[in-house]
């Protein structure tokens, strides 16, 4: 019989090798977030401002609010940027709400501190301990030179309306020379009003104001100035005098507020 070939089993094809996918990359490290308390402390050190901070992912801090001057906006940005783990600061939400009285007082305080001001400050005692004066209230100040510093005492009120009032020296109280610790009373009550004595009363425009007492071993300004003048120009003049006049100096700022009578 014819020879019949045995059927062969089908060839077995080995399975194709499956390519192994590379492992996924590790997630990027999580950047540490700034400490909220540290950011708030940095903002609290910026004077004449009301600023809020919003912490966003990636160390971004967004600032909103107001400051009295462009320089204080920059100061807020720089102080927050210096906080650990702050990556960027967005100050686009900050606006300038001009407050020339507050800003002028801060400039004077900082100038005296930078020049190594005296260890003790002048004294400013108010007849309203809370510093709040309503329309037509009489303003009385017990001012004094610092202990250990005799010379000349200058007392001004800077308002956020942009004016400065010179309480000492002025035409009716021209002598501002005092010994160390020497005291002087500025202003009188209604019953004490008389010819030749200056009285000071709260009046519009209302709002915050800043009483500034500057003590200097030597005279700072020649002669007497008008009782009222623009604050910005006067602060520049006084800063120049502080920088150019030798001798010890000290400053105190007392915030007060003038309000309409309820």
Task: Enumerate the language-model features and the residues they cover.
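Secretory-pathway glycoprotein ectodomains that are cysteine- and/or Ser/Thr/Pro-rich
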Residues: 3-262
């Amino acid at each position: 019989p014819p020879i019949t070939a045995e059927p062969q089993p089908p060839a077995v094809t080995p399975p194709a090798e499956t390519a192994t996918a590379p492992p996924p990359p590790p997630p990027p490290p999580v950047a540490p977030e700034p400490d909220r308390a540290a950011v708030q402390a940095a903002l609290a050190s910026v004077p004449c401002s009301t600023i809020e901070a919003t912490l966003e992912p990636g160390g971004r801090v967004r600032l909103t609010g107001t400051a009295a001057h462009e320089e204080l906006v920059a100061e807020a940005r720089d102080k927050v940027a210096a906080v650990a783990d702050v990556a960027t600061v967005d100050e686009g939400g900050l606006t300038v709400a001009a407050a020339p009285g507050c800003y002028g007082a801060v400039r004077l305080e900082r100038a005296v501190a930078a020049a190594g001001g005296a260890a003790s400050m002048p004294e400013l005692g108010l007849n309203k301990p809370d510093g709040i004066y309503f329309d037509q209230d009489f303003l009385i100040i017990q001012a004094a030179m610092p202990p250990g510093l005799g010379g000349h005492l200058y007392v001004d009120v800077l308002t956020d309306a942009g004016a400065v009032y010179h309480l000492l020296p002025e035409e009716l109280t021209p002598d501002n020379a005092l010994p160390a610790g020497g005291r002087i009373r500025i202003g009188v009550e209604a019953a004490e009003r008389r010819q030749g004595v200056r009285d000071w009363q709260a009046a519009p425009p209302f709002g915050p104001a800043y009483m500034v007492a500057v003590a200097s071993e030597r005279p700072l300004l020649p002669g007497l100035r008008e009782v009222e003048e623009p604050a910005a120009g006067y602060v520049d003049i006084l800063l120049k005098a502080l920088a150019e006049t030798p001798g010890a100096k000290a400053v105190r700022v007392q915030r007060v507020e003038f309000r309409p009578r309820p």
